[in-house]
A protein has these predicted regions:
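A short, histidine- and acid-enriched strand-loop-helix "catalytic/donor-clamping" loop
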Residues: 80-84, 101-120, 135
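An aromatic- and histidine-rich active-site surface loop
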Residues: 75-99
């Protein structure tokens, strides 16, 4: 099976992140599937803010092209609940749903998982994302309960580290 999996760079020289580590582990330990890594997210030394606009637009074009080239692939979408990723990733996930492709959303913690006060826009986006009819995977049973209680998600499973 072809699986498109999103994560920042898997090169530890470029990016030291929990998401990258988990994705690398998944790819390295599931040889029966063909993984297509789609690099999404900034590198550790890369500037953020407005400097991310052009790379993001380029990534959107590449993402659309990849989805059209691999319509039968399963998308394993890595989703950290941080301010920037909530806004960015909701658009990428919407494109997957619009193509009618199967998707699993793998939640990788983040500030908004435990924050009491989430800005209105991000809260609306999160509620919309977690209402999608796709399976969600969290890294612990505590995260599963939090996602269900806080965002109303229905289909959430635990895949502990």
């Amino acid at each position: 099976m072809d699986i498109i999996i999103t994560a920042p760079s898997l090169d530890p020289e470029q990016n030291v992140s929990g998401v990258s580590s988990v994705v690398k582990f998944i790819i390295d330990n599931n040889k029966e599937h063909y993984y297509i890594h789609f690099e999404l997210g900034k590198k550790d030394r890369e500037r953020g803010g407005v400097f991310r606009l052009f790379p993001l637009l380029k990534a959107l074009r590449q993402w659309r092209h990849l989805l059209k080239q691999t319509p039968k692939a399963l998308v394993h979408y890595s989703f950290p609940l941080s301010a920037a990723s909530v806004i960015r990733d909701s658009l990428f996930m919407w494109m997957v749903r619009r193509q009618g492709m199967k998707m699993i959303v793998h939640v990788h913690g983040g500030l908004y998982l435990t924050a009491d006060n989430i800005p209105w826009l991000q809260r609306c986006i999160l509620k919309k994302v977690f209402s999608m009819p796709v399976p969600f995977v969290a890294l612990s049973n505590t995260e599963v309960d939090t996602i269900k209680d806080k965002f109303g998600a229905k289909d959430v499973s635990s895949l502990p580290n």
